[in-house]
């Protein structure tokens, strides 16, 4: 399969992951899609993420990731199907990693995979859908050597 992943760093800051790492993570999430695909990963600051989250979800605060699936008119065909955009706020990921005592790279991996899965049609609104999405995320993270982020460790319960 051929994947075209456009990376846009609108933060103006150096990121903890290279463009190659971001591309590999997005490609991993696309692997079972079994079709050529194109998507954009846009990295934004807190101000832009707050604006997007307020505009599209009516929540006036930043979030870690938003996914915007592409919907083209039926009469338009592209050589490589455009899935849409994954928008990530690195500042939010950094804060969440510290708050939850998680590896920054592991958290980036989870959030990027999560966003790409949304473009593929996965969701977590209903419990059954959430379970399927979380199992797939955990499987992909395990391939990268990361623990299942949805399992609570015993020492976290104390």
From Swiss-Prot:
The protein's predominant localisation is cytoplasm
Q: What is this protein called?
A: Endoribonuclease YbeY
Q: What does UniProt give as GO cellular component?
A: cytoplasm
Q: Which GO terms describe its molecular function?
A: metalloendopeptidase activity; RNA endonuclease activity; zinc ion binding
Keyword rRNA processing tagged:
yes
Q: Where does Zn(2+) bind?
A: 114, 118, 124
User: What's this protein's family per the entry?
Assistant: Belongs to the endoribonuclease YbeY family.
Query: Does this UniProt record's set of keywords contain Cell membrane?
Result: no
Q: Which residues form a coiled coil?
A: none
Q: What is its EC number?
A: 3.1.-.-
Q: Which cysteines are joined by disulfide bonds?
A: none
Briefly, what is this protein's role? Single strand-specific metallo-endoribonuclease involved in late-stage 70S ribosome quality control and in maturation of the 3' terminus of the 16S rRNA.
What UniProt keywords apply to this chain's record, in alphabetical order?
Cytoplasm, Endonuclease, Hydrolase, Metal-binding, Nuclease, Ribosome biogenesis, rRNA processing, Zinc
Q: Which cofactor does it need?
A: Zn(2+)
Entry cofactor note text? Binds 1 zinc ion.
EC supergroup of this enzyme: hydrolase
Phylogenetic lineage: Bacteria, Pseudomonadati, Pseudomonadota, Gammaproteobacteria, Legionellales
Biological process terms in GO annotation = rRNA processing
State its location(s).
Answer: Cytoplasm
């Amino acid at each position: 399969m051929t994947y075209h992943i456009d990376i846009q760093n609108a933060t103006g800051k150096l990121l903890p992951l290279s463009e190659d790492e971001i591309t590999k993570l997005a490609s991993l999430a696309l692997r079972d899609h079994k079709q050529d695909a194109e998507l954009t990963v846009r990295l934004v600051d807190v101000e832009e993420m707050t604006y997007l989250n307020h505009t599209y979800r009516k929540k006036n605060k930043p979030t870690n990731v938003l996914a915007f699936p592409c919907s083209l008119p039926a009469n338009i065909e592209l050589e490589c199907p455009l899935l849409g955009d994954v928008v990530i706020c690195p500042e939010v990921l950094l804060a969440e990693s510290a708050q939850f005592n998680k590896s920054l790279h592991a958290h980036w991996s989870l959030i990027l995979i999560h966003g790409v899965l949304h473009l593929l049609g996965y969701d977590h609104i209903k419990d059954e859908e959430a379970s399927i999405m979380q199992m797939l995320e955990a499987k992909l993270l395990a391939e990268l050597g990361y623990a299942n982020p949805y399992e609570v460790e015993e020492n976290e319960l104390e």
